[in-house]
Amino acid sequence: ELPTFGVGRIHTLFMYPMTFDEFLNANNENGLISMKKQADSQHPLDAAFHEKLIEYFRIYLLVGGMPEAVLAWIKTHNFNQCSHIQEDIILTYEDDFSKYKKRVSPDLLRTTLHGICHQPGEKITFKQISADYRSSQIREAVRLLTLAGLVIPVIATSGNGIPLDAEANEKNMKILLLDSGLL
């Protein structure tokens, strides 16, 4: 059971990690955003700008899009500083798991999240996440992590038309973390 709070006194705002374009904008690289949007097969980016975009993308993959980590990067250009902030964010998420303890063990949520982080971009196998829990328990933990917005399941489909999920195969699934910097 989740704690209650006063109705009408809370304004909900859903926030997500910054996109790559927002990351570029935060780094005052609006010119790169514009060039990237205008580039196509007929008018490709100049090699120098392409290299600069690749470098920024590599940084983005490490720093991620969490606003505090991005701000730390802009101020310090220090990956260690960003890493400390990312660790604090993960610990905050894990501390929050206790509010789900009536439905799922906080240890199971923690184990599932760490297991997902150790299989980035790979087909998820629940046994690799943990041999200590049943698949149904891990599936429920993944469902709660998805509802919380911490992970994004990507389900394979062999559909050739609409709707694509008509031939979805949930046994062949990858699970992405909400932000690459938190890996």
Residue ranges and their predicted role:
Residues 2-118:
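Interdomain motor-coupling "hinge/lid" segment immediately C-terminal to the ATP-binding subdomain
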Residues 70-183:
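Accessory nucleic acid-recognition modules appended to NTPase machines
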